[in-house]
Every structure is written in C-alpha cells, then in structure tokens.
Amino acid sequence: KTTSDVIDNYRSNQSKESASLVRLASSPWMYRLFLMRHLPMAFIARLKVKEISLTSCTISVPYNWINKNPFRSTYFAVLSMAAEMSTGLLAMAYVRNAKPSISMLVTNIEGSFTKKAVGPTMFKCNSGDAMRLAIEEAIITSQPQTFRCQTIGTNGQGDEIALFYITWSFKVKNSKSGS
C-alpha cells in the first residue's frame, strides 16, 4: 500500500469512529457510564462535556465540596484533570479503533494558574485539526509523534483561570506484538 492509501484508509475508518466517540461524549448518560468504567475520578469530580466536535472540546468542572481545597478554591489536581480531558477526548476521537492501531500517552503537562477558581471552570481546547495532522504524521512515518495542546480554563465571567499545555505522544502500534 502507498502512504496515500494508508492515510485514506485511516481517514475513512476514523470518520465513523470519531463520530461515534462524539456521540458517546455528547450523551450525558453514556458519558457517565464511560467515566464510571474508565475514569472513575473524573466521575467523582463531576467533570462534564459541555461541547465536543472534531476540532474542539470543552469540559466543565464544578466548584463543590469534593473538588475544593483548604483555600476555598478548586483543587489544582481537579483543574488539571479537566484540562487533560479537554485534550484527551479529542485525541481519543482520532485514535479510537484506528486502523492502523495507535497508542496515545501524555508525556508532559504544564499549567499556570492566573486566578482562583471559586466557581465552575470550563476548559476549552481548539487543537483537534492540528492533532489529527500529528497522528497522520505518525502513520506516514511510522515514528512516534508528539503534539503540544493548549487548553484554557475560564470562569463564568469568561476570565482566564488557568492555562495548560498537555503534550501527547502518538505511536503506531506494531501489529505483530500489539504494542
């Protein structure tokens, strides 16, 4: 197969798989079941998908007793989890049941906090298109690719609460060993 054939095959298969993940994440009931099974801490923290497409994802995290710290703001680890999820759902949309099979892994996370989170916080990542290109590059070259996503957390007034950079590694799995 030519490189073009491999990418065309990936895109054809992934358009259905990506749409399936977007539907799952858009259904509150199915999303909660997914969290309970695969990400129970996100379920406990009550992270919610506010918006998801193949280009962007917005995750909300409430300010409540289980998420707060002793300083009466949302605990940084909960904010970090929401930030990672806003990028991770986009990545999952592009690697879920991919042909060829692709692994994804967070290799770095950087966060800066600009304001106390004392209410609901929304994390939005708009890196879906660029992320897809990085994944396609991993397929074309058969070499691991890293991609650095930006996600911005804002409060209900639109003020920036936090800025995160999540670095993902994408690698085509070896079909013989499954790794």
What are these regions (language model features)?
Residues 27-36, 41-42, 132-134:
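Short Pro/Gly-enriched beta-strand edge/turn motifs at strand-loop
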Residues 66-88, 101:
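Hot-dog-fold acyl-thioester-processing enzymes
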Residues 44-74:
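Catalytic strand-loop segment that frames the active site of acyl-thioester-processing enzymes
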